[in-house]
A protein has these predicted regions:
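Adenosine-phosphate binding glycine-rich loop
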Residues: 252, 256-313
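Conserved S-adenosyl-L-methionine
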Residues: 165-171, 271-275
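Phosphate/diphosphate ligand-binding glycine-rich loop within oxidoreductases
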Residues: 9, 14-139
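Short, conserved loop/helix-junction motifs that constitute active-site signature segments
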Residues: 22, 142-143, 168, 242-251
């Protein structure tokens, strides 16, 4: 039997039985990306499939944007169960699926596709994955928190904001370098966040501000949870996400960056006496929820956690 390759291509997908027919298990799940070699999804999903007794292999597929629509159609012809989707395809897949969940529709992005006959069903597990991660890390629900999201204008930030709004968080502060993007998102989320039957507190429940220290300082007194939804922190030379002087012991800090495990933001939070966690738990839970979307049964989450941790060394 042949070894599973690190990455398969669009040309492979066009002749899927020829490209994968001699594998031990049929390759019926994948992750689409461009690039895709960095994806840790196979290290999570393949142990889970084995533990669940499902005869299936999960592989990486390098799909370029121009080939995306045809690649999605080929899934139906090649007996796929589904696929995950990573950069840069989440918006393109959103436009191509036949049906989608409410959270995917509101975010405008799909990261998980299930094949159902001749239909493609889209979901976004990044958003509910964040919800699960916050619960696991801090034993708190989004609905009970006043939340600041830094980088709300990006894809990860919008996913976080939509989930917080759908859960009716106590307060939502959207921070973005281009404040117009944060303001546009606030307008989209207004009806979810602003409850006419709920009395306003000492601060507005939905705010959009620029990514500037003075603007953030004005809001920080009325914030419990700070979420970094930017890529700032991946390099040691990166600037501060939040000025260290603004972080207080009562704050909860969640950094979606997970490599390095201890970013500057996490270090600053811990030095301030605040609880902090990196994005590894969100990566895990979005995978768990994707598995459950495909199979409509509980995923072996701890098996997936072990695979993910082993992939990181």
């Amino acid at each position: 039997m042949a070894e599973v390759r690190d990455v398969y291509t669009f040309d492979d997908l066009k002749n899927w039985s020829g490209a994968t027919g001699d594998l031990d298990r049929p390759a019926r799940l994948s992750v689409f990306g461009d690039p895709v070699k960095h994806s840790r999804s196979p290290q999570m999903h393949n142990p889970a499939l084995e533990a669940a007794g499902i005869n299936c292999e999960y592989v990486r597929l390098h799909i370029q944007p121009d080939d995306l629509a045809e690649a999605l159609n080929l899934l139906k012809e090649s007996d796929f169960i589904g696929t995950n989707v990573t950069i840069p395809h989440k918006g393109g897949v959103h436009d191509a699926v036949d049906e989608m969940t409410e959270v995917a529709r509101r975010i405008g992005a799909v990261n998980t596709v299930a094949v159902d006959g001749d239909q493609l069903l889209g979901h976004n597990t990044d958003a509910p994955g964040l919800k699960k991660a916050i619960r696991e890390e801090f034993s708190m629900d989004l609905s009970d928190l006043r939340i600041m999201i830094v980088g709300a204008g990006g894809g990860a930030g919008k996913a976080a904001a939509v989930q917080c709004a759908m859960d009716h968080c106590e307060r939502l502060v959207l921070v973005n370098r281009t404040v117009e993007k944060a303001e546009a998102l606030a307008e989209e989320l207004h009806d979810l966040v602003i409850d006419p039957d709920k009395l306003e507190g000492p601060a507005d429940r939905l705010v959009a501000i620029p990514w500037e220290s003075e603007a953030m300082e004005r809001e920080m007194e009325n914030v419990d949870l700070i979420i970094n939804a930017t890529s700032v922190g991946m390099k040691r030379t990166d600037p501060e996400v939040v000025p260290a002087s603004l972080i207080e012991p009562h704050h909860l800090v969640y950094d979606m960056v997970y490599a390095p495990a201890r970013t500057r933001l996490i270090a600053d939070a811990e030095e301030a006496g605040a609880k902090a966690a990196n994005g590894l738990s969100m990566l895990l839970w979005q995978g768990v929820l994707a598995f459950e979307f495909w199979f409509d049964s509980a995923a072996p989450a701890e098996v997936m956690r072990k695979g993910l941790l082993e992939s990181l060394g």
